[in-house]
């Protein structure tokens, strides 16, 4: 049986050229072409520490590159390398633009320059007769000649510095300024018609003054000659601004960042159980919440406490949150995000105990947040005691009012007037309504003979029973009766609307007495 022969794959450059388009190159092909093999990485890493240049160490094919290797012993020649630097733009030479002839200086002459008084010559122009017409200034031709040596003035401005590309040549560009202008003043003295022309140079030395008047016109702008220095001005009496620093909330200095990070890493991590307790023993003596027993009042609670109990005397803790606590740390004070003070204690439970006596338990973080103290309302209080400059007058009659109608009667009314009813009763346009109960009631309204005013008096009938015996008078047509009528006696009453009746004793049937003898 003949074994299958292994087919050789294509070259690495051909494989990389084909698989690069699809992006599924083999790792060895890609690393070989891109020089990312393990050897290439080691060379890069070691090359950053030690120098390996000139050794020819690499992962190439060993052909010496595109130019090949030079044979041993062959003369070496220097190959041209680098870039050719082109010359820059030619710059003008340093010096004045025009050649000015200068007087020859005698070495034996004195170096002190004598001072001379400069006087302006007066030019007199004959204007003819006195009565003739005046001479207009525009008709006068004034010609001044300039001296090329004495008219050269310096400038106070800084020259322009031009530097080349290689920063090796510095050229100063000095531009001479134009000579100052001449000013001509024309005036007339007195009543004469002879004008006076004064030619004054534009440059005036310091300390000299001219006899000319100066007119300031805001429509014309001046020319600034020379270098001007701009000095920033500061405002006077400006409003000062300051920041109010927040006062500290505690008297102790602020803890460092390292201690804060250590505390956060110690109390607030995933291996520490967080328990919020409201037991007041957490603030003073936490042992009251862990074990039952006598507490020493002189005991300092600001230390770490360790609790050891025998298995025979195991009892439940007074607080269920502090069960199986074998160690509790000292109190730590911090501040919450809401501004409250938090008291924290780090404890450890003894849940599991091995035969060797090792206790294993979870770390517990007990914290107690103190309640906030609300700000007191601002109540304006009165000052106690007497002070100079202050006086208070108290009058009980003004502050209080006493009501007693008997002691302080009204002087406008007498006793009789107070008993009278000041209200006037008016019964005009009124109706008389008579009401009665279930039983029949008789009302007697007396009649008054005609001719007299009709006056009807209605008694105020309440819940009581009133019995009335009316009298009837028959007035004959002739006048009043002479003898009064006498009512019948005794009167006889009959009730027609009675709800019951009563038999008289004489109407009852008499029963005969029967004897049992027969």
From Swiss-Prot:
One GO cellular component, as annotated: host cell endosome
Biological source species: Human papillomavirus 65
Record carries keyword Phosphoprotein: yes
Disulfide bonds: 19-25
Motif Nuclear localization signal positions after renumbering to this chain: 1-10, 509-515
Location of this chain's protein in the cell: Virion; Host nucleus; Host early endosome; Host Golgi apparatus
Protein name (record): Minor capsid protein L2
Subunit and partners: Interacts with major capsid protein L1. Interacts with E2; this interaction inhibits E2 transcriptional activity but not the DNA replication function E2. Interacts with host GADD45GIP1. Interacts with host HSPA8; this interaction is required for L2 nuclear translocation. Interacts with host importins KPNB2 and KPNB3. Forms a complex with importin alpha2-beta1 heterodimers via interaction with the importin alpha2 adapter. Interacts with host DYNLT1; this interaction is essential for virus intracellular transport during entry.
UniProt keyword terms in alphabetical order: Capsid protein, Cytoplasmic inwards viral transport, Disulfide bond, DNA-binding, Host endosome, Host Golgi apparatus, Host nucleus, Host-virus interaction, Late protein, Microtubular inwards viral transport, Phosphoprotein, Viral penetration into host nucleus, Virion, Virus entry into host cell
Post-translational modifications reported in the UniProt record: Highly phosphorylated.
Pfam family, one: Late_protein_L2
Its job: Minor protein of the capsid that localizes along the inner surface of the virion, within the central cavities beneath the L1 pentamers. Plays a role in capsid stabilization through interaction with the major capsid protein L1. Once the virion enters the host cell, L2 escorts the genomic DNA into the nucleus by promoting escape from the endosomal compartments and traffic through the host Golgi network.
Gene Ontology terms: biological process: microtubule-dependent intracellular transport of viral material towards nucleus; symbiont entry into host cell; viral penetration into host nucleus
Lineage: superkingdom: Viruses
Family: Belongs to the papillomaviridae L2 protein family.
Molecular function terms from GO: DNA binding; structural molecule activity
């Amino acid at each position: 049986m003949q074994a299958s022969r292994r087919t050789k794959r294509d070259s690495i450059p051909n494989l990389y050229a084909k698989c690069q388009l699809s992006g599924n190159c083999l790792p060895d092909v890609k690393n070989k072409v891109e020089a990312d093999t393990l050897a290439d990485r080691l060379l890069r890493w070691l090359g950053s520490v030690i120098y390996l240049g000139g050794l020819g160490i690499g992962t190439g094919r060993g052909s010496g590159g595109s130019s090949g290797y030079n044979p041993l012993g062959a003369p070496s020649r220097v190959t041209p390398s680098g870039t050719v630097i082109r010359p820059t733009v030619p710059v003008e030479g340093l010096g004045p633009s025009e050649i000015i002839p200068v007087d020859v200086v005698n070495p034996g002459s004195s170096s002190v320059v004598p001072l001379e008084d400069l006087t302006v010559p007066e030019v007199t122009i004959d204007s003819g007769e006195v009565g003739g017409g005046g001479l207009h200034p525009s008709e006068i031709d004034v010609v001044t000649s300039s001296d090329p040596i004495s008219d050269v003035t310096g400038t106070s401005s800084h020259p322009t510095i031009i530097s080349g590309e290689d920063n090796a040549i510095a050229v100063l560009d000095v531009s001479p300024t134009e000579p100052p202008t001449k000013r001509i003043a024309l005036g007339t003295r007195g009543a004469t018609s002879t004008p006076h022309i004064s030619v004054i140079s534009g440059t005036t030395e310091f300390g000299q003054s001219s006899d000319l008047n100066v007119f300031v016109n805001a429509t014309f702008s001046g020319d600034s000659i020379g270098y001007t220095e701009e000095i920033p001005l500061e405002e006077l009496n400006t409003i000062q601004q300051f920041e109010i620093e927040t006062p500290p909330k505690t008297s102790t200095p602020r803890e460092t960042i390292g201690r804060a990070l250590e505390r956060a890493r110690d109390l607030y991590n995933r291996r520490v159980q967080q328990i919020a307790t409201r037991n007041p023993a957490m603030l003073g003596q936490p042992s009251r919440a862990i074990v039952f027993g006598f507490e020493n009042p002189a005991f300092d609670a600001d230390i770490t406490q360790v609790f050891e109990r025998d298995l025979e005397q195991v009892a439940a803790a007074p607080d269920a949150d502090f069960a199986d606590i074998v160690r509790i740390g000292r109190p730590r004070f911090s501040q919450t995000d809401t501004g409250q003070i938090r008291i924290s204690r780090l404890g450890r439970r003894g849940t599991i105990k091995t035969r060797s006596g090792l206790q294993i338990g979870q770390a517990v973080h007990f914290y107690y947040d103190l309640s906030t103290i609300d700000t007191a309302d601002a109540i304006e209080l009165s000052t106690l005691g007497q002070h100079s400059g202050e006086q208070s007058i108290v009058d009980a009659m003004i502050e209080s009012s006493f009501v007693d109608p008997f002691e302080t009667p009204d002087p406008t009314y007498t006793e009789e007037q107070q008993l009278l009813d000041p209200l006037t009763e008016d019964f005009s346009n009124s109706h008389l309504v008579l009401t009665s109960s279930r039983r029949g009631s008789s009302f007697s309204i007396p009649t008054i003979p005609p001719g007299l005013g009709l006056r009807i008096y209605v008694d105020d009938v309440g819940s009581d029973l009133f019995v009335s015996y009316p009298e009837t008078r028959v007035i004959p047509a002739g006048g009043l009766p002479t003898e009064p009528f006498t009512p019948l006696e005794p009167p006889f009453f009959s009730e027609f609307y009675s709800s019951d009746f009563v038999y008289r004793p004489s109407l009852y049937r008499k029963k005969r007495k029967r004897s049992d003898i027969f």
